[in-house]
Amino acid sequence: MRGKFIRRKTPLIVFEGIDGAGSTTQTDLLFKYLKSKNHRVIKTCEPTDGPIGKLIRRALKHELKFSWQTLQLMYSADRADHLDKLILPAVNAGKIVISDRYFFSTLAYGELNLDGKWLRELCKNFPMPSVTFLIDTPVSVAMERMESSRGSKELYERKNFLDKVRKNYLKQAKEFSFYVLDGTKTKSEIAKEVLEILKKKKFI
């Protein structure tokens, strides 16, 4: 599966990883750094805070129940709205966009319960990000982080499930040329690697 890349002066930067890997932390750190350097930048995430994204978040917290297929259709609808209303207008306006998760999450998580070909068909028209960072974190480390920061587990937060998700992400890393970062390093060490890569690619 190969969607069109976003080719603009400013990039779409994506962070991926299993729950507890640190993608949200790295999104926040990069956003703060770029703001401090007076870059025009926005940060966002999936699921979004839009109407569909809010329903997905309720499902993840076990407040609503949908079939796996329905949930992935909702993710795709949320993403399409996300691209149309925020990501593409921002990139076209010359702003750097940093997203905590993108369609790679659909493939990594969704393929455990649904047909991979069907999921890829859902995702095939979504544009490729300019660069994707996979924070590869052992499940035991991620689970420990989540247990210390959250009171209850979300829908996908089970060890055997996350082990498989991690393997799916590593397969995607080869297919989509992710930059794979060691999630056991400190957050500052990872952030430094991210900046080095972005500067080398002349995105910042």
List where the protein language model places each region.
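A glycine- and Lys/Arg-enriched "phosphate-lid" helix/loop adjacent to the NTP-binding pocket
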Residues: 101, 106-167
